[in-house]
């Protein structure tokens, strides 16, 4: 099937979806209606561009016909040639745009995310770097107009982060931050280092799409829910009423503890959001591991432990190892200006997928 057959198939499906979404039987089925609505929304831009492309093709035909019928009239011929030139230029631009729009879409791109950051190898320095990454993502989220909510955090004795879980909400969050999963390495002189030696530490980042209850059902029988008293610094109980919640997904032993909120229900709701995302992500990773290597993400190996980026403080340098990008502006990037890296990763991914599409 060539690109134009694919585009026509997308338009045909779009029109079919429009009819289905006005069917009372579909409207009454919330789950199906939501799925079809998302499918329609995901193809809307492609269909609009394809229809514009067909209009441009018609303009080219009309201009060529006008030239033939100009009857030697130089004014009409010149006008038709100018229209033809503009239409052909627009045709090339739309062909490039349509190729990009035909690339397989990640169904999670428009979703909010659950962001997890952990200090890994390097002790206190790794925990401090995890805090730097948290601040970087918070500032980037602010620049994008997203909402950033820390849901759970644990700190070490020097103010570094052992682990933090955050919800980032807004437009197309996952599409921009999905490439951040992996090991982030830092090279710098710790404040406690008296001889000026550079130490290397790592923090790990995990980005998971938020999973709505209607998208992924967890059998209540597979969950163990424990209620206990929230504890403060030093381990003392800070609530007379048991408000802290621990949820364990028994088949995978994935567990979430939540005690940030003042009520049991709010802690339970937040814990369910996280465990739903983790369980869905767990099984998505298993499914991905079973796919052929060509079908895995084109950026990196997809291995969560893969070192994806190095932040070198002495050289003010950031290197993304997956695409060979080096920027001498570490201070700028840690201040939340991630756009250059994000754009480069998105472009690289699209380029690889376009090459694959052209080779089919």
Swiss-Prot record:
Q: List the Gene Ontology MF annotations in alphabetical order.
A: translation release factor activity, codon specific
Q: Where do Basic and acidic residues bias regions lie? A: 293-308
Location(s) in or outside the cell: Cytoplasm
Highest taxon, organism lineage: Bacteria
- UniProt keyword annotations, A-Z: Cytoplasm, Methylation, Protein biosynthesis
List, alphabetically, the InterPro entries matched.
Answer: PCRF, Pep_chain_release_fac_I, Pep_chain_release_fac_I_sf, Prokaryotic/Mito_RF, RF-1
The record ties this protein, via SUPFAM superfamilies, to: Release factor
Offer one Pfam family short name for this entry: RF-1
Q: Where is this region: Disordered?
A: 288-308
N5-methylglutamine PTM positions read: 236
**Protein family membership:** Belongs to the prokaryotic/mitochondrial release factor family.
Per the entry, what this protein does is: Peptide chain release factor 1 directs the termination of translation in response to the peptide chain termination codons UAG and UAA.
For this entry, the protein name equals: Peptide chain release factor 1
Query: Source species, please?
Result: Streptococcus equi subsp. equi (strain 4047)
């Amino acid at each position: 099937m060539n690109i134009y057959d694919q585009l026509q198939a997308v338009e045909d499906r779009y029109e079919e979806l429009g009819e289905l979404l006005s069917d009372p039987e579909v409207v009454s089925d919330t789950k199906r209606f939501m799925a079809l609505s998302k499918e329609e929304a995901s193809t809307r831009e492609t269909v609009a561009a394809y229809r514009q492309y067909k209009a441009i093709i018609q303009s080219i035909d009309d201009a060529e016909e006008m030239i033939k019928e100009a009857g030697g009239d130089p004014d009409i011929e010149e006008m038709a040639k100018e229209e033809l030139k503009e239409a052909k230029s627009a045709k090339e631009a739309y062909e490039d745009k349509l190729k990009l729009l035909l690339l397989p879409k990640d169904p999670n791109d428009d979703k909010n995310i659950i962001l997890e950051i952990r200090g890994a190898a390097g002790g206190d320095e790794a925990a401090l770097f995890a805090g730097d990454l948290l601040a970087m993502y918070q500032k980037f989220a602010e620049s994008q107009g997203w909402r950033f909510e820390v849901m759970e955090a644990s700190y070490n004795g020097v103010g570094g982060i052992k682990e933090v879980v955050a919800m980032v909400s807004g437009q197309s969050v996952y599409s921009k931050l999905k490439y951040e999963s992996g090991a982030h390495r830092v090279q710098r002189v710790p404040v406690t280092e008296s001889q000026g030696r550079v130490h290397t530490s790592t923090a790990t980042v995990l980005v998971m799409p938020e999973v709505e209850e209607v998208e992924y059902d967890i059998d209540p029988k597979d969950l163990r829910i424990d209620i206990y008293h929230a504890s403060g610094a030093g381990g003392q109980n800070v609530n007379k009423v048991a408000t802290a919640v621990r949820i364990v997904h028994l088949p995978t032993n994935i567990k979430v503890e939540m005690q940030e909120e003042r009520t049991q229900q709010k802690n339970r709701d937040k814990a369910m959001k996280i465990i739903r995302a983790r369980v869905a992500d767990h099984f998505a990773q298993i499914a991905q591991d079973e796919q052929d290597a060509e079908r895995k993400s084109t950026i990196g190996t997809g291995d969560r432990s893969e070192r994806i980026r190095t932040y070198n403080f002495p050289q003010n340098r950031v290197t993304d190892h997956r695409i060979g990008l080096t920027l001498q502006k570490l201070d700028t990037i840690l201040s939340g200006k991630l756009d250059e890296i994000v754009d480069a990763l998105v472009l690289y991914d699209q380029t690889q997928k376009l090459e694959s599409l052209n080779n089919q």
